[in-house]
Design a protein with these regions (language model features):
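N-terminal cap/lid segment of alpha/beta-hydrolase-fold proteins
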Residues: 21-72, 104, 179
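Short beta-strand element of the alpha/beta-hydrolase
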Residues: 74-83
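Active-site glycine-rich loops that stabilize anionic/oxyanionic intermediates
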Residues: 82-87, 261-262
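Short amphipathic alpha-helix adjacent to the substrate-entry channel of hydrolases
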Residues: 92-111, 275
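Gly/Ser-rich "nucleophile elbow"/oxyanion-hole loop immediately N-terminal to the catalytic nucleophile
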Residues: 130-133, 137-208
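Primarily recognizes the serine-hydrolase "nucleophile elbow" in alpha/beta-hydrolase
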Residues: 176-252
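The feature captures the conserved acid-bearing segment of alpha/beta-hydrolase catalytic domains
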Residues: 230-288
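C-terminal catalytic histidine-bearing segment of alpha/beta-hydrolase fold enzymes
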Residues: 283-321
Length: 321
């Protein structure tokens, strides 16, 4: 009976969260540069809660707003940039779960659905072709491997140039798509601040929290911001290195990083980012955990990385009063 009560309460809370959402498009009409997109967005829902679990083939970017109850609101807001290797949004873990956690602590959460790679149906394997071995690393034309495929460990972070980890410079399509996602994040920052009074948000307390590829998008939006309205008040990246060359902004933007030491390339990339920030005289905090590589799940409480959210929240309150 107790378990049933907990389950019902969880479902009711999830339903309340969904009913309280606002979804706003970032652009009027088609997003600039996506005029030729013909793919259809795909959405997967959690069969238990009915909440969105995963999104792919996004070409119409938007923000989804999750606001805390007015009696808890602190005025702080976090724009959540989910991970998924630019192929999908890990919306359930990186947005829905994180938004609920932040709302409970009085922080507004805004899920950013930035543009992704178009997903095409898998092509049939040519007759006689050998299956690709598990763990084999893809190569670009010409046989050269992109930086993220060099399999660097954290001790080799100095081999990364200005934190640029992925995509490779000669991956024109990857660079173009990354810039579209970065543009989406900059527009999202402006849009959130334009609604600050309506949503009970302090426009000076709005920042990014990105996961994996979403961390790269958040970093890109920060280092390419051209106006005060686009510059975040803080930047946090969770196992997400930069996807472009980094020129640390002159504006003060405190940086928070969390990753796992054995998450090869990623750990090296974010350490390089940390050093860039410190060399520029900026505030930066980094947590590198010893447990196995991969994403931080919601049930990691028994692992060293299970404390990352509390560390982020303490850092946020210390940095943004």
């Amino acid at each position: 009976m107790k378990r049933l009560a907990i389950t019902i309460a969880t479902l009711l809370f999830g339903a309340a969260t969904l009913s309280a959402q606002q979804v706003l498009p970032l652009y009027e009409g088609v997003a600039p540069g996506s005029e030729d997109r013909t793919d259809t967005e795909q959405v997967t829902y959690n069969q238990t809660t009915g909440e969105i679990e995963r999104i792919s083939s996004t070409s119409s970017p938007s923000i989804t707003v999750y606001l805390p109850s007015p009696d808890k609101a602190t005025g702080k807001a976090v724009i959540l940039c989910s991970g998924g290797a630019m192929m999908f949004h890990s919306w359930g873990n990186d947005v829905v779960n994180m938004a609920r956690w932040l709302n409970e602590r009085g922080v507004a959460a805004i899920g950013l659905k930035y543009r992704l790679k178009p997903m095409t149906p898998p092509q049939p394997r040519p007759q006689g072709a050998q299956p690709r071995q598990q763990g084999a690393q893809p190569r670009q034309q010409g046989g050269q491997m992109p930086p993220m495929m060099l399999n660097l460990d954290i001790t080799q972070f100095d081999q990364l140039v200005k934190s640029n980890a992925d995509p490779a410079a000669n991956d024109a399509e990857g660079v173009r798509l990354n810039m579209q996602a970065v543009d989406d994040a900059r527009v999202a920052m402006r849009l959130v601040r334009s609604h600050a009074e309506e949503w009970n948000i302090d426009p000076e307390k709005v920042g990014f929290l990105g996961f994996s590829a979403g961390g790269g998008v958040a970093i890109g939006a920060t280092v390419t911001a051209t106006t005060p309205e686009e510059m975040p008040s803080f930047l946090a990246t969770i196992y997400g290195p930069s996807l472009m060359e980094v020129e640390v902004p002159e504006s003060e933007v405190p940086l928070f990083i969390a990753t796992r030491a054995e998450h090869r390339n990623v750990a090296a990339g974010v350490m390089s980012l940390f050093m860039d920030w410190k060399r520029a005289g900026q505030s930066a905090e980094m947590h590198i955990y010893a447990d196995p590589q991969g994403a931080f799940g919601p049930d990691d409480t028994g692992l060293p990385s299970g404390s990352w959210r509390e560390s982020f929240f303490r850092w946020l309150n210390y940095t943004i009063e």
